Structure formats: C-alpha cells, structure tokens
C-alpha cells in the first residue's frame, strides 16, 4: 500500500484546487518560509481525522477554510481527498484504490467519506488501526514533533509503542468491557436495593393476607343472610303493587272525559285568537305605512338641509378659485421679468468669451517664437560641450589613477564602517542577550505563578467533583423512586384494563350478551358505557342507578326480544334491556319552587349526565325522577317539602327513597364501581404520562450531572497536563539561560577580534590618502586651462534656462485662459437651461389658469341645479303631509275592532280555566295512587340496588343460596353478630392476598436477575483479565524489538555510540512509561535533555526509524525535521532515507539542498500573491511546469 494522490480544495492558503501525485518513493516539498508548505502536511493530518484546531495551527476548525485575500473572495467550505493504493489488500476493503475524504463548512461541522460514501470518523480510525497510519502515529512527524517526542513524558511516549505493538484495538475492547462491568455493577447494586426493600414488605403483607381471607369468609356468610331477607321483602311489595294499579285504571277513564270537554273549548278559543291575529296584522301594516311616509317627509327635509350646506361650500370654493387665478397671474409676471434678465446676461457672457479667445490666439503665437530661439541656443551649447570632451584625453590617465586611489579609500572606509557596524551589531546582540536573560527570568517567575494558579484550580475542581458525586447519588435515588412509582401505576392500570377486557363486575347475563354482541343486532351497550359524569357527581349517579348501570340499551324491542331469546337458548342468565323506541322518560315536575330554594339542592340527576341526544329519553327514564343534593341534611329538608314519588341521592352516596326510607353510611371502597372504572383508567394514564415525563426529566438531570462530573474530571486531567507542560516549560527556560551565558562569552571574544581589525584598516587608509593628494594637485593645474570654456558653457546654459522658464510661464497662461473659457461656457449653458425651465413653467401656468376657469364655470352651474332641486323637494313635502293625516284616521278605526275581539277571547279563557281546575283535581287523585305505586317501586328498586350493588345479585335471576326464613328476629340478631365480628377485624386490605402473591413472584424474578448479573460480572472480569494479559504480552514483545532496532539505528546515524529504552515500571507492563537513554560516540551515557539540539533531533529520528523497522508504515511524512541538523548529518540522514525508500514512501518538507538531492520529485510552494499559495512541480528530467 502506498500514497497515490492528494487533492485540496479551499484548504487554508490554497484558494484554487490542487492535486499532488506521489509517483516517486521520495517526494520533497520546498519553498520559502510562510509560503504554505506545511499546509499540505496539515491537510493529510486533517483528512486522517485530526480533531484539534490547535494542532492544525488554528483557533477553530473553520479556520482551515480559505479566508480570502486582496484578489480572491473567502470560500465557505474546504475539502481534502487522499488516495491510497490498496492492491496488496492491507486495508480490509475489496478495492484497489481507497479514497478517504473530509469536508468542512463554516459552522465547523465535518463530514467524512470513504470511497465517496459518507461515514463516521470511527469507521476511518478502525480502517487504519494498527497499520501505522493515523493522525497521532509516528508516520507523520511535523514541525517541532521531534522535540515533542523526545521531551514527552514516559507515559505519553508509551502510546507510540502501543501503536507499534498493535494493541490499540485491545485497549479499545478493554475500555468497552470496563464500561460494561461498571454498568453491571450499577445494575447489581440497583437489584440488591430493590430486593432489600421488597424483603422488608414480605412479613407485614403475609399477615394482612391472612386477615383478608378471614374477612372474605365472614363477609360471604353475612351476604347470604342479608340477601335472603331482602328477597322476602321484594316479593311482598310486588303483591301490593298489583292492587294499586287497578285503582289507577278507573281514574284514567274519568280523566279522559274531562279532557275531551276541555279540548272543545280550547278549539273555540283558538279560532277567535286567529281572527284577532288577522286584525292585529292589519293594524301593524297601517302603522308601518304611516311611519314610512313620516320617514320620507323627514328624509326630504334632511335633503333640503344638505343641499343648503352644499351651496354654501360651492360659494366658498368659488372665492378660493378667484384667489388662485390672481396668484397665477402674479407668478407669470415674475417669470417674464426673470427671462428678460437672463437674456441680458447671456449677451454679456458672449462678449467675455470672444475677448478670451483673442487673447488665447496671441499667446500661442508668442510661444512658438520662444520655442524657435530655445532650440537654437541648445544646439550652440551642444557644440561647446563636444570641444571640452575632445580636450579631456590628457586628463583620463591621471583621473583613472586618482579614481583607483579614491575607490581603494572608499573600500577601506566601508570596511571600517562594516567593522563598526559589526561591532555595534554584536554589542546590540550582547545587550539583547542581557535583555532576553531578564525576560527569561521574568518568564520563569510567570510560569511559577501559573503553576500555583493551576494547582489552586485543581483544588477547586476536586471540591466540585465531591459535590457533583453527592448530587449524582441523590439524583439516582430520586430516579429510582420515580421509576418505582411508575411501575406501581402501570401495574394498577394493567389490572383495570384486564377487568375492563374480562367484563369483571358485570352480571352473568350481561357478560354473555356483550361477548355475543357480534352475533346479535341492535345492541348499543350497557348504560355505564354510554354516559359521562363529572367526578363530583360520580358517586351520586352510581348510587342512583345501582344495578341499572348494567342495563343494556338496544335500538328497539325486536333487538331486546332477540337478546332474551339468546339468553334462554344458551342458559346464559338474565339481563334487563332498554329499547330506545319504547322507553319514555319520567321527570320530576316542580310546581312548588320551594324545593329549588333549599340550601344544598343541586338538580335532577339526569341533568348531570352527558350522552348522545337519542339516548336522553332512556336517561330520563332512569334518572328523571331522582334529585341530587349536597348532603343528607339538605336531602331530608327536600323530602319534607315534596312528599311524592321520587328519590333523593346525596353526593356522599346517601339515599332517601320515595317512601321515605333513608339508606346511608360508609361505602365499601373495594366495591367494583363500573361508572368510575373508565375514569380511573384515564386518570391513571395521565398519572403514568406525568410520571414518564418526570422520569425523563430525572433521567435528563442524571445524565447532565454525569456529564458535568465527566467534564470536571476532564478539566482535572487537562489541568494536570497543563501543570506537567508548565514544568517542562520551566525546565526549558533553565536550559535557555545556560545557553545564553555561553553565547555571551562567545560574543565577548568576537568583540576583541573586531577591535584589532579596526586598527589595521586605519593605518592602510592613511597611506592611501597621501598618494591621492599628489594626483589631486596635478589635476588642479590641468583644470585651470579649461575654466574659460566652462564659463562660456555656463552662460549658454543660463540663456537656455531663461528661455525654458519663459516658455513654461506662457504655457501656464494659455492653460489658465482655457480654464476661464470653460467656466464662462459652463455659466452660459446654466443660464440657457434656466431660460428653458422658466419658459416651460409659463406654459404650465397658462394651462392651470384654463383649468381654474373651467372649474369656476362648473361651480356656477352646480349652484343653479341645487336651486331647482330645492323647489321639487318642497312640493314632495306638502304631498306627504296629506297622506300621513289620512293614515292616522284609518289607524284609529282598526284599533277599536281589535279591542272588541280581545274582550270575547277573555270570556272563553275563563271557561277553559274552570275545566282545567276540575281536570287537575282528578289528576291529583291519580297522582296519589301513583305515589303509592312509586313508593313500593322505590322500595323494590332500593332492594334491587342493594342486591345488585352490594351483593351482585338480581332478584329475576334467583339466588343459589336461597333459604326460607321463619324467624326474622333471630335472622336480624345473626346479621348484627356477623357485622360485629367483621368490625373487630378493623381496617382490612382486601388486595393483600394478590399483593402478597405478586410480591413473592417479584422477589423470585429479581433474585434470578441478581444471579444472572453475578454471572455476567464474573464473565466480564475474566474477559478484561485475558485482554490485559494479551496487551502485556504484545507490549513487551514490541518493546524488546523496538529497543534492539533503536540501538542499531542510532549507531548507523551517529557512526557509533549506543542507545537504549528503559521502562519506568517494569513490573506494571500495562501502565509503565518509556524513557530514552543515549550515548553519542566519544561521550558519556546521559539523558536526552542534556544533549544538544542536533543530537536530540538525530536520536528522535533513530527512534522513528526503529518503529519503522518493527512495524513499517506504508508512507512517512517528515516536516522540516532536518532543520536542527548540520550539513554532514543531513547528508547522512538523506542517504539513510534513500536506503529505506525501498520499503516505504516518503513525503519530506525541507529547506536543505542535501535532502532535495535525494528526491526524485520536487514540489515547490510559492506565494506570489499575499495569502494565496501556488504549487509547481519538477522532476530531475523535466523543466518546471
């Protein structure tokens, strides 16, 4: 496997896309500092998954996107693609070329791609694991990486050995196993807590279960006795009901005769009322017409007022138009005057322009004459200068010798200056070293302060860690409490759902009908399922309905017959059916409003029930004669006021039956309430949802606390690392101080050498000046001979200068004339535009004047029309007044006729009232019989309610434990004895039996889970031990191999010496660090921190190549690691790379010629434009592309 190609788009300083082909074993990247060479190395590191922006020399990940320059806009994304040749299938992919890509947007979010398909960073890391490649492996050695490897802590250096040993995947597996072990321990602790809590509940719950069994036995015996007593009463009441119903039929016949007479009188009354209605309608029409005509007259009067206001408005507008016309005429006069003024100014400007043009032409002629004289003088000057040049031949030799001496003196002076400059520079360097020494000592003090600050922060983090751990423990407890509550509510909800699905609490006959409803037709459902009741009235309605909650509502009597036949055929028990087409509601009729005024009266029971409209008659039938009150006191007061056949139920479930019997007391809380069951299910669902939300919040809080704790732990580790880094920085400052002292000594010796050079140069300069003086005297005598000719030349030159000055002055005057002409022309153009604008405005004013005159004429015409309309409206007003007077007379006549008809109707109404009184008397007699019937029915209903609600028995179905009671007194005494025995038991948890059984099952289940978790813990612990043994073995094997190769490589690079690796904790191979000890040729064995920079760099290189031999990487990237080496070591290192390029591919960023010489392909990076890198390539056999 080797690197084939690298593509960059918008990455760092590369604004344009570039492609680098790696066709040679050794590829070099060269270029000046700051040109962007290292950005190519950063691109490879980045595409392999680097997550630290700081490592990529940025503050955030979006900094890798090209930020723009003077000529290039900033980009909004960057991408890098790396092509790997995989023909030898080192990577576990069935392709010959593997393409790894990474893209980033301005938000800093990265996407990874493998062969063009999006993937995770972990997928790429897993692919490259143990191949020697990756963002943190030794295959990429960046700027300063050599020193960082050597100066790494022993624990950090160990990571390179782990990569070489191939134990990264084992380390990852171990971490996963430890997480699973931690989770298992956590689950184990939670299970043990639950078992401990449940075991505490077993003893008390077992006693409660035994007590509940005894309670059930006594309760069953009491039920048999009470049911038989109630059934005997129910049979006797049925016999009395039959007698009362016969008396009721006789009264019904008499009521029918009175009703017919009343109907006849009512028909006569209705006929008269219809006649009266016709007359009243006629009266209403007359009144409507009367008021309409009055309204028209008022409307005509209003219109007259409006017309008057309009006429006044038009008059005002006419006056305003007159004023506008006057203003327009004034403006026209102003504009005419301005136009005359503009004409005068235009004439003046024309005269000025003509004068300037004449002056311009005369100046131009003068300029041409001066130019001609100037050319003639320059030609004479040229001939004089040539004559002097011809006479200078004799002076050339002397001048040449003089110049040589002069040049030599200049060189000596420059040498003296250079020596002075060098001395000043060295003195400055010496002062800078002193200053740098002071800064280093200041830095040392600053580092010490930072270390103390970091240690203080570390102490605060430890306290925060303890606080978070305590809060986390409390959050876990709260989470467990909420989860337990949720489990309890879910269990209760499940029980209610099971009861609902199994029809628990319904009579046998009702159950069989509901189960067979798919076979039968017309079944709507039981009463309990078809109504909705507010929780406040739930107990009252359940008490009022009793067993009738299980009555089955059907569409019609045919459906009822079908259901009864089905029960008979299947012997499925009995049920009561309510056909919608036959059931008629009965409702209490309050003629006496005193009942409503009773404090505590709430209303008729049926009004507190919601149902479908078509079922309301059924609800009226069931509850229309039942009143609901707040308590028993108000119920008794209502019963006293209204002694008729109705039932009163309180909100507490107490009942006053129609006969006056009062039923009340405590309710059986364990009784199966059919009406409230659905509501309880909905309430429980809401509670479960609330608990689930609360559990989610607790879980979220728990996760937040765990994340905060992890964050604090991470911060602690960062602070610890910072302290270690600061200690290293402090040590480096100490080393720099030692180096500074050495450099200062060298500079002092150099200053002494420079002072000796300075004295020698001064002596040589004195001799040179003496020789130069002799030649200078000789030159002076020759120069006197040419002085006359020079004077003549100077005169000519002055004449030329005067003419040139005069030429320039006249030229300036011409330029000023041009400017003045341009300004005058501009003013003339401005006046012409103003003249044009004023003429245009005059035209517009004329048009406006015409418009105002036209509007004035229209106003005069409109005023005339208003005067005509006023005359018409006055005529209409007189006509309407006559019609109104006639309508008033017709109204009076019709009102008299209506009054007569009303008197006849009053007489008939008295007759009808008398018949109604007699009818009501007979109805009262019938009502008394109905009351007696109702009382007996209510007594039987109460008996049925008690049987159905308290004992789940229907009289129609019979009773399996029916007995004949001969001694009612003895039976009553037995009931009291049984009730006392039940009372002595006290509070009984009737669900204790089921709860005890559930608790035992739950404990068994948790114990099995506990055993499974113990086995899992043992298994995971064993896996971790096996992984650790494998890691120790692989690490030890890799360490021995690298140690041997490191010593060999060190000897090859240093031409001798020795080096070795040592373990800081040999007995702990899983965590031991690694230290490096080296001995260059001719020196003692010592630690790397005491070696020179070049020795440390070469030692680091030896270590890298030792790793290469033990676990070769397919390619290596070296970023200026040869910088600290001298030429000899660079040559040796370059040959070494050349040798190993047979086994691996190298990409080298370098400045060194010796290293470039070994490369077959060289890429140059330049920055011709600021901030934009450009790539060029060259091969040994090719020109630069």
Curated annotation (Swiss-Prot):
Q: Which UniProt keywords apply?
A: ATP-binding, Coiled coil, Cytoplasm, DNA-binding, Nucleotide-binding
Q: Which SUPFAM superfamilies match?
A: P-loop containing nucleoside triphosphate hydrolases, Smc hinge domain
Localization annotation: Cytoplasm
Q: What is its main location?
A: cytoplasm
Pfam families with a match to the protein in the record:
SMC_hinge, SMC_N
From which residue to which does any coiled coil extend? 167-494, 677-1031
Q: Does the keyword DNA-binding apply?
A: yes
- The residues listed in the UniProt record as binding ATP, with positions renumbered to this chain, are 32-39
One Gene Ontology molecular-function label: ATP hydrolysis activity
**GO CC list:** chromosome; cytoplasm
Q: How does it assemble?
A: Homodimer.
What family name appears in the similarity comment?
A: Belongs to the SMC family.
Q: What does this protein do?
A: Required for chromosome condensation and partitioning.
- Domain description: Contains large globular domains required for ATP hydrolysis at each terminus and a third globular domain forming a flexible SMC hinge near the middle of the molecule. These domains are separated by coiled-coil structures.
Q: What is this protein called?
A: Chromosome partition protein Smc
Identify the species of origin.
Halothermothrix orenii (strain H 168 / OCM 544 / DSM 9562)
